[in-house]
Each structure stands twice: as C-alpha cells, then as structure tokens.
Amino acid sequence: MNQHYSETRKIDPSRGATLGDNTPNDNNRIEIGPTQLAFGEWATAGLALPDLQRMREFRWNRLTQAVVDRDYGGVLMFDPLNIRYATDSTNMQLWNAHNPFRALLVCADGYMVIWDYKNSPFLSTFNPLVREQRFGADLFYFDRGDKVDVAADAFSNEVRTLIAEHGGGNMRLAVDKIMLHGLRALEAQGFEIMEGEELTEKTRAIKGPDEILAMRCAVHACETSVAAMEHFAREAVPQGNTSEDDVWAVLHAENIKRGGEWIETRLLASGPRTNPWFQECGPRIIQNNEIISFDTDLIGSYGICVDISRSWWVGDAAPPADMVYAMQHAHEHIMTNMEMLKPGVTIPELSERSHRLDEQFQAQKYGCLMHGVGLCDEWPLVAYPDQAVPGSYDYPLEPGMVLCVEAAVGAVGGNFTIKLEDQVLITETGYENLTSYPFDPALMGR
C-alpha cells in the first residue's frame, strides 16, 4: 500500500506553525482543542479566536496573585476543573472527578507543579508554566488500599519541601478538595489549612479578554449543536418512536464534533416528565404535540461551560393557553432580572429586587435566580429572596463576571415545566447577553 506524505504530515501548510488560537498547528499534538468543523463555523460567523498562551498566563497570574494577597504559601488543588483552569490540561476528567489522582500546587512565587497519573506525565508538558510533572497524589482507597497513609505522608512531605523553596516557608496552605488521609498528613507536616475554594472560585469568577473570546466561541458551538438537536426533534418526534435519549444524544454528538468535552447532567425531559423538573433524560417516547424542556450544562469548546435552557413545543397543534402563559411569565422573569445586572450592584440587592413569580409557581421555582459560570457552574450564587442566607454572598458584581439567569416555571401537580436560561457577561457599563438562541415562537404565543 502506498502512503502519501499528505496523509502523515503533521502541519497544515495553509495555516502556518500555529492555529488561530496560538496553539501548535500539529495534527499529532498532545493538547486537545476545537475541531476543524468548529474553527470553520467560527470563521464564517466572524468570531475572533482567543490567544490560548495569553489566556493561560492570565489565569496563572490571577491564581498566583490570589495566593500572595491572602498571605498563603501556596494553593493545592485536586478539583479537576481547578487544575484545568491553572494548567489548561486534562486527564480523564470525569474519572478524575471521583478518583482524585491529580493534584496541582501553585506556590507564592508562581512555581507550579502537577502530580499526574504516573503513566501520563506528558499531558501538561505543552504548557511551560507547569514547571514539574510528578506522580503520587492518588490518595484514594482503590489505588492505595490499606497503605493510603504511607502515600499521603510522602506526598505531604513533597508539598512541604516545595513550599519551603517557593512559598517562603509560609505554612498557610490553601486546599480545595482533599481526601481524609491527605488532610491529616498535611496537618502533620505543620500546615495551617486554609479554604482553597474561596480562593479558586473568586479567582475564576473574573474572566480575562481571551477567556471571553473562548466563551463566545463555545457559546456559538453550543447553540449550533442545540439547533441540530432541535431540527432532529422536530423531524423525528412527529413520526413516533423517538425517545428523550434519542434527542439528547444529538447534543452530545454535536458537542464532541466541535471539540467539546462532556455534559454535566441529563436534564432533558418531555411531556409530563418535565414536572417536577430535574427528572433525568430517559427512554420515554416523546409524543406529538408535547413539550420538551432541557438545560445544556455543557462543557464545550476550550473546556468552557455553556449553560442555557429552552423549552420547545413539538407538534402541529397549538400549545395550551396555560403553557403559553407560563412561557411568557418565565421569559419575563429572566429578562426582568437580567436588566438589573451591572458592575457595583450587590448580590443581596439582586435577590431583593428580583422579579417575583406567580404564587402558583413558587413551590417549584428553580434553586437560584442566577449563578456564575466559566469552566462549570461557579461562584457566585444569587438566591431567591426567601432562600437567601444573610452574609453568604455580600459582594458586588464586577466586569468580567459571567452569570446564568434562569427560571423553572411549573405548578405543583401540573403536567409541564418551562425551563429558560441565558448566559450573560457583566461589562464595564452593564451587561451583554451572550445567548442568542431563539425562544420557541409557539410557546411565546406568536
């Protein structure tokens, strides 16, 4: 068999040494990223690409400054999304979420060390900000059995040595999520353990210019994927024998096609299964002239979360009047609440001034008015007035924050729930709704 050079070459000569996002134009590279399909769609849409080298440096600088500002020796992270934020590297993210084998230490001088799976230390080598790759942070029972304490002692000693060298010997160490033996071992080394999530969540809350560009690209890819799902649903459901899972599978596939990574939940339901909300997507056959409601919770291109929700009426008959009213009411709810968004407004003020849903929808209203979003659902959370805890979120909004504004509108004992959600950027002067996906005109009564 003849093998042609065009089939094996590593670089596309039409693109130069780097792609438009300033990552290597190498077909065999280690780091993951958007696909050619995604790049082509973004170019057609006129979207500017992020500079990933600059984005990584921005994130690293924010983390390092956060450590210094709090007078810590460093921050030790096990959460795979905190590690993604700091290094932009991934390794079996969902498996890692319940088997924490990865750890990352950012010291007060910016020195960054990752502990990775021993067979794949190369997965972060594309990022020069990661100065060392080690292994040995897997402190869970499956991996260590009855000798977890021995591994934890060795790991904690490495952390102590690194903080002595790169954290000024400051024994105040922020930690986000850690297994029990790891915590005990760090304390035995003399560390004062500080709340790492407070540091990482507030650091991640402000998005830099390149993160915002990456999010715009991710939103476009998500909305394109949602459009494919809607097209499939409207074509297939009236023909019969199309399940919720069939529809949901389209979003998964379209996300992966564009370099997206996973979907956090299974929040797509149809007909009476939409009420109460939070029933998971399943094998139910969707009937003609029924509602479909969903929440993307999608980790998409560049690892950016796009968290939007829509409800569709699928069929040839008109939706019932009470459903149209609920849709209009939900739309009014999120749009009225969105109008409050601007720098300087505090989270308690957002709660206090929020639009009030009708009494019939109070019992099953959503768990929050708004929440932050970046690599996943993030800090802060804006609670409904009757659920707000005084003192828990006494902070103002700042430019660069991104919030999801949402509503779940369905009456107790009803046969539907409307689910709506848009993703919104806080600007210097107000807000910008990053979401452009249309609302179902039939449900809007148009």
Swiss-Prot record:
GO terms for molecular function: dimethylpropiothetin dethiomethylase activity; metal ion binding; protein homodimerization activity. It catalyses: S,S-dimethyl-beta-propiothetin = acrylate + dimethyl sulfide + H(+). Keywords: Iron, Lyase, Metal-binding. Residues 1-13 have a biased composition (Basic and acidic residues). A divalent metal cation 2 binds at D307, H371, E406, E421. Its EC number is 4.4.1.3. Its cofactor is a divalent metal cation. Changing H371A: Unable to generate dimethyl sulfide (DMS) from dimethylsulfoniopropionate (DMSP). A divalent metal cation 1 binds at D295, D297, D307, E421. Optimum pH is 6.0. According to a report, does not bind any metal ion as cofactor. A crystal structure complexed with 2 Fe(2+) ions has however been observed for an ortholog, suggesting that it binds 2 divalent metal cation ions per subunit. It comes from the Bacteria. Pfam families: Peptidase_M24. Signal peptide: none annotated. Residues 1-30 are annotated as: Disordered. Able to cleave dimethylsulfoniopropionate (DMSP), releasing dimethyl sulfide (DMS). DMS is the principal form by which sulfur is transported from oceans to the atmosphere. The real activity of the protein is however subject to debate and it is unclear whether it constitutes a real dimethylsulfoniopropionate lyase in vivo: the low activity with DMSP as substrate suggests that DMSP is not its native substrate. Belongs to the peptidase M24B family. PANTHER family: AMINOPEPTIDASE (PTHR46112), XAA-PRO AMINOPEPTIDASE P-RELATED (PTHR46112:SF2). NCBIfam families: DimsulpropLyDddP. Homodimer. This is Dimethylsulfoniopropionate lyase DddP. It comes from Roseovarius nubinhibens (strain ATCC BAA-591 / DSM 15170 / ISM). The gene is dddP.
